[in-house]
Amino acid sequence: MGLLSQYMCERAQGTRHAIVIDPADQSPDVAANRALAAANAGSRMILVGGSSDTDMTNVHATIVSIKEALELVTWASTQDSDSDENPSQIPVVLFPQGAAALSPDADGITFMMLMNSKDPRFLIGEQVRGAPFVKKSGIEPVPMGYLICEPGGKAGEVGKADLIGYDDHER
């Protein structure tokens, strides 16, 4: 079990909150400020990604900006540049829309299968495309099954989800 998986399991007994920051919605600096605000409010994980068409450059810049901001806050609180303390105690994890939106600086990646997609690309295709990058970069994959319910929103549309209805109790 990797460090990120251990972190997630250690926190299984308490309340947890993760925030999703979509790099397409703001600049990397604004994303870093939002991540800091979320961390100050109690978020214990920052997920970077979403259903938008975001390229690797934007995702990478957002991850780097968030991690630098978290490191600066940690350093400022210790005022010890020689501290052995982990600079980013809140993991920054990729929540990618596909293999074209990755960064080697992430602490991990949700390696997800959109379980109710009608498109094989979202069932296994993007995972196959992204696997060599994940292995080469050494970022920790976190297996994840993902279901989209009605109304589905942009993620349901992009992922070609066979939406689970409000009253659909048999699936």
PLM features: residue spans?
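Generic structural signal for hydrophobic
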Residues: 37-38, 66, 101, 171
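Glycine-rich, proline-tolerant flexible connector loops at the mouths of alpha/beta enzymes
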Residues: 45-63
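Short, acidic/polar
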Residues: 26-37, 97, 166-170
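Conserved anion-binding
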Residues: 97-171
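Alpha-helix-loop-beta-strand connector modules within alpha/beta enzyme cores
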Residues: 57-98, 130-142
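N-terminal amphipathic alpha-helix/helix-capping segment at the start of soluble metabolic enzymes
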Residues: 1-21, 127-143
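Hydrophobic faces of well-ordered beta-strands that scaffold small-molecule active sites
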Residues: 16-21, 46-48, 92-94, 109-111, ...
